[in-house]
């Protein structure tokens, strides 16, 4: 199944966090925090203004982004966990 985001929404795949501490202790999945960065998979057409114009999203597929810990809505597609997030919830693009 493929997802096509609507309006100013962006689909992001979370990037894996390091599962070991600097001293070599392995962190189990149940104790690890969800990462707050990811890769943009798909981008909606943009936000519609009151006068009907569409403001395009300032991101593209492949961009690495930072977002808030509680941003967006998690969905599972074909066993893969993705995040549907509004453009204004994305804090920065990693360059």
Curated annotation (Swiss-Prot):
One of its GO terms (cellular component) is cytoplasm. GO terms for biological process: chaperone cofactor-dependent protein refolding. Keywords: Chaperone, Cytoplasm. InterPro entries: Chaperonin_GroES, Chaperonin_GroES_sf, Chaprnonin_Cpn10_CS, GroES-like_sf. It is found in: Cytoplasm. The keyword Chaperone applies. One of its GO terms (molecular function) is ATP binding. PANTHER family: 10 KDA HEAT SHOCK PROTEIN, CO-CHAPERONIN GROES. Belongs to the GroES chaperonin family. Together with the chaperonin GroEL, plays an essential role in assisting protein folding. The GroEL-GroES system forms a nano-cage that allows encapsulation of the non-native substrate proteins and provides a physical environment optimized to promote and accelerate protein folding. GroES binds to the apical surface of the GroEL ring, thereby capping the opening of the GroEL channel. Heptamer of 7 subunits arranged in a ring. Interacts with the chaperonin GroEL. This is Co-chaperonin GroES. The gene is groES.
